[in-house]
């Protein structure tokens, strides 16, 4: 038995990660600063090289935020509007299809479809958006509708979750973003997003999606009113789901963008975490998930390009999407822009010392640069 957690070596961390992931106690020690952070980051990088190699992937995609009107009032969200706000909007299904076609013509392989919960929406509206996308851009991958939106669709349709997901899949839904997870801690959720679905509901919807052959991502939004213990509990739950279903394609840590978030502006949350903690969260995710969730994404929109490059040397192997509009982070106060050209993201990866690879949503290689 070790006298001190800091006695764990880089090789031990790497071996544990590759063999299935470090235990939660070691992960918590790392996030609480009880382990040398540089040792943790080095181990995460070496584990990443063993698990997925030195390529850094990205997807050419377009975000389509089809409405900013929402019945929920999440206290971190600066994107939502009331129906009578002057800048409230809702796209028609035809407009959504046109944006998908524009994205395809610009070289995108994916559209990411998410929006607020509009009080006048119907389930048919959600189906029609999928129909229009597949009509106007039949080959594009539709990565859409978070578990919160799926729950809302079930309410609108008066159907159970499984039937709704089957209908969405038939209409063209290819995969789902694992957003709306935020932080699973019930105490934090009550303060952060009291209107949002509970963690058990999120897990239930995700598990059914995986059973139906709809792969999803998984996420964690951190740095607001949470703690490292909350982060580990969150990741532990995700690991349990992945052990059962294998349906997660990637884990995306989402650093809290505080500037315009209502909870921060009212003095109820801290302004995110330090850059070092951002990098450590990605490193610990790599070591904790090991080969179980092989892809750890660094969100350049949330972190900024330079910090995202740092995470590539600390466990992350993916930079996400080129985006072509990303309204939610922008409204929250993110300053890194709404899109990158593929050539820009390729250069960012090369500058960090890696081989860029364009991928599909499901991590199939499209082009090695």
Swiss-Prot record:
It catalyses: 5-amino-6-(D-ribitylamino)uracil + L-tyrosine + S-adenosyl-L-methionine = 5-amino-5-(4-hydroxybenzyl)-6-(D-ribitylimino)-5,6-dihydrouracil + 2-iminoacetate + 5'-deoxyadenosine + L-methionine + H(+). InterPro entries: Aldolase_TIM, CofH/MnqC-like_C, CofH_family, Elp3/MiaA/NifB-like_rSAM, F420, FO_synthase_su2, rSAM. Its cofactor is [4Fe-4S] cluster. One of its GO terms (molecular function) is iron ion binding. Residues 56-292 form the Radical SAM core domain. It holds the Pfam family CofH_C. [4Fe-4S] cluster binds at residues 70, 74, 77. Gene3D superfamilies: Aldolase class I. Disulfide bonds: none annotated. Pathway: Cofactor biosynthesis; coenzyme F0 biosynthesis. Binds 1 [4Fe-4S] cluster. The cluster is coordinated with 3 cysteines and an exchangeable S-adenosyl-L-methionine. Its EC number is 2.5.1.147. Keywords: 4Fe-4S, Iron, Iron-sulfur, Metal-binding, S-adenosyl-L-methionine, Transferase. Consists of two subunits, CofG and CofH. Catalyzes the radical-mediated synthesis of 5-amino-5-(4-hydroxybenzyl)-6-(D-ribitylimino)-5,6-dihydrouracil from 5-amino-6-(D-ribitylamino)uracil and L-tyrosine. NCBIfam families: CofH family radical SAM protein, F420_cofH, PRK07360.1. Belongs to the radical SAM superfamily. CofH family. PANTHER family: FO SYNTHASE (COFH), LIPOYL SYNTHASE 2. This is 5-amino-6-(D-ribitylamino)uracil--L-tyrosine 4-hydroxyphenyl transferase. The lineage of its organism: Archaea, Methanobacteriati, Methanobacteriota, Methanomada group, Methanopyri.
